[in-house]
């Protein structure tokens, strides 16, 4: 059974056979669940500033749910 991948940008798990795998020149492998995540990553957007990402939700818990 194939394992589920986790999006490198938003942190959402997604099914095998969907999404995109991107391999950088240094050998690091990035998985993207959608074109939106892929585009935001390559534009240099910080996932901690976008409410729909897991990184934002974790950062929010650390800073005290303002």
UniProtKB/Swiss-Prot annotation:
The UniProt record lists the keyword Ribonucleoprotein = yes
Q: What highest taxon heads this organism's lineage?
A: Archaea
Q: Which UniProt keywords are present, listed alphabetically?
A: Metal-binding, Ribonucleoprotein, Ribosomal protein, RNA-binding, rRNA-binding, Zinc, Zinc-finger
Zinc finger map (C4-type)? 7-37
User: In which residues is Zn(2+) bound?
Assistant: 7, 10, 33, 37
Q: What does the record give as the function of this protein? A: Binds to the 23S rRNA.
Q: How does it assemble?
A: Part of the 50S ribosomal subunit. Forms a cluster with proteins L3 and L14.
Name of the protein: Large ribosomal subunit protein eL24
| Organism of origin | Pyrococcus horikoshii (strain ATCC 700860 / DSM 12428 / JCM 9974 / NBRC 100139 / OT-3)
Q: What is the lineage of its organism?
A: Archaea, Methanobacteriati, Methanobacteriota, Thermococci, Thermococcales
What gene is behind this protein?
rpl24e
């Amino acid at each position: 059974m194939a394992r589920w991948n986790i999006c490198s940008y938003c942190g959402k798990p997604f099914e095998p056979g969907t999404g995109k795998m991107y391999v950088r020149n240094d050998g690091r492998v990035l998985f993207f669940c959608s074109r939106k995540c892929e585009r935001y990553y390559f534009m240099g957007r910080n996932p901690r500033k976008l409410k729909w990402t897991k990184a934002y939700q974790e950062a929010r818990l650390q800073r005290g749910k303002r």
